């Protein structure tokens, strides 16, 4: 056992040991830092931190170029192995998670004030570490607001730690980022000549949901299909160049609405309210044929404003923030639309939902 008082390493520190110390210090110094620990656990944490510092003092030669773990200065690891995909990509990581975003492109905004949040939750974000670890994973509250990805220390933060516009990026699952039990929970957002952002979700399912939501927005941004124009109330404007595929009545007291319905193919539109149940079934049978363009039908995605429990079997029940895809607005005059959520189709009160995207 080397003498702790020595100022240089008696022999090179094996890479496996350095990697182990990296994991231990990340867990003890960072992950446990914000946890509510018992007195005994806090004492043990401080003891482990001290032991790690002792090891660094013993192997001073190997760590002298890495600087103090708390000074925030960057370094290059002279003992790093041959470059691989991950190490090369790391040069494009967010080098300082606490620094302002690139070019101060977006103004500071509190996490609770973000508009049109499509997906939010806690993730572990990979970044360049400032100690001898090389890399670290830090817990961040992340949110996709419209087409901008924000990350915060917590969902109560008044200002983001960073953000980036996802335009031009691609997203994919990546199980090579970790070797522990969370390897199947990882995904990355990347683009040529831009920083790579890599995250770990709480579960593989959560990671897949992040990937699918990001892909949906990215595909919509790249699509040449222009969604139908809606006013602020979510009602459809008349298109003078093309006939409407289904009946979408305007909320208006003008009697000309009935004439519009009669000109459309669906004759059932003018049926009396007593036949609504039959129309509902026909509508729900037909909407399956119109949902194929869902990935690009940006304007028909809504989210719940309040919790709503359906009174009948043909009505959807949903919570505040739930994503609902609107399949039909043919019952607009009654205040109901036909929507789909998690594979279930039913009637949705339009007063209980709002547009997900600001078009």
From Swiss-Prot:
Domain of life: Eukaryota
Region Disordered, residue ranges: 66-88, 264-293
Presence of the UniProt keyword Cytoplasm in the record: yes
Keywords recorded for this protein, A-Z: B-cell activation, Cytoplasm, Phosphoprotein, SH3 domain
CDD domains: PH_Skap-hom_Skap2, SH3_SKAP2
GO CC annotations, alphabetized: cytoplasm; cytosol; nucleoplasm; plasma membrane
Region (Homodimerization): 14-64
GO biological process, one term: negative regulation of cell population proliferation
Disulphide-bridged cysteine pairs: none
Positions of post-translational Phosphotyrosine modification: 75, 151, 197, 261
Phosphoserine: modified positions: 5-6, 9, 87, 90, 223, 283, 286
InterPro entries, alphabetized: PH-like_dom_sf (IPR011993), PH_domain (IPR001849), SH3-like_dom_sf (IPR036028), SH3_domain (IPR001452), SKAP_fam (IPR037781)
Subcellular location: Cytoplasm
Expression by tissue: Ubiquitously expressed. Present in platelets (at protein level).
UniProt domain comment: The SH3 domain interacts with FYB1 and PTK2B.
Quaternary structure, from the entry: Homodimer. Interacts with PTPNS1. Part of a complex consisting of SKAP2, FYB1 and PTPNS1. Part of a complex consisting of SKAP2, FYB1 and LILRB3. May interact with actin. Interacts with FYB1, which is required for SKAP2 protein stability. Interacts with LAT, GRB2, PTK2B and PRAM1. May interact with FYN, HCK and LYN. Interacts with FASLG.
Name listed for the protein in its UniProt record: Src kinase-associated phosphoprotein 2
Organism: Homo sapiens
């Amino acid at each position: 056992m080397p003498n702790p008082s020595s100022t240089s390493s008696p022999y090179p520190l094996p890479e496996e040991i350095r990697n182990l110390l990296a994991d231990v210090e990340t867990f003890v110094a960072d992950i446990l830092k914000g946890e509510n620990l018992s007195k005994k656990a806090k004492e043990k944490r401080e003891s482990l931190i001290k032991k790690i510092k002792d090891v660094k003092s013993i192997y001073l030669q190997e760590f002298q170029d890495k600087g103090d773990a708390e000074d925030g200065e960057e370094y290059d690891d002279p003992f790093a192995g041959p470059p691989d995909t991950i190490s090369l990509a790391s040069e494009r990581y967010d080098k300082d998670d606490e620094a302002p975003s690139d070019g101060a492109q977006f103004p500071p905004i509190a996490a609770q004030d973000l508009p049109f949040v499509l997906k939010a939750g806690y993730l572990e974000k990979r970044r360049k570490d400032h100690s001898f670890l090389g890399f670290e994973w830090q817990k961040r509250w992340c949110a996709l607001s419209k087409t901008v990805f924000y990350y915060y220390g917590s969902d109560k933060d008044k200002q983001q730690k960073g953000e980036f516009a996802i335009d031009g990026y691609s997203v994919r699952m990546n199980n090579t980022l970790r070797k522990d039990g969370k390897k199947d929970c990882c995904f990355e957002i990347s683009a040529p000549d831009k920083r790579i952002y890599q995250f770990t979700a709480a579960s593989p399912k959560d990671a897949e949901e992040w990937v699918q939501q990001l892909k949906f927005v990215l595909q919509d941004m790249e699509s040449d299909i222009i969604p139908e124009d809606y006013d602020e109330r979510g009602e459809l404007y008349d298109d003078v160049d093309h006939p409407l595929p289904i009946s979408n009545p305007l909320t208006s007291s003008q009697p000309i609405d009935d004439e519009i319905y009669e000109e459309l193919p669906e004759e059932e539109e003018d049926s009396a309210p007593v036949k609504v149940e039959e129309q509902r079934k026909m509508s729900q049978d037909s909407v399956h044929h119109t949902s194929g363009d869902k990935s690009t039908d940006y304007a028909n995605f809504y989210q719940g404003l309040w919790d709503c429990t359906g009174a009948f079997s043909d009505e959807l029940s949903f919570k505040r923030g739930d994503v609902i895809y609107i399949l039909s607005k043919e019952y607009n005059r009654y205040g109901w639309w036909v929507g789909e959520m998690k594979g279930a189709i039913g009637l949705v009160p339009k007063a209980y939902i709002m547009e997900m995207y600001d078009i």
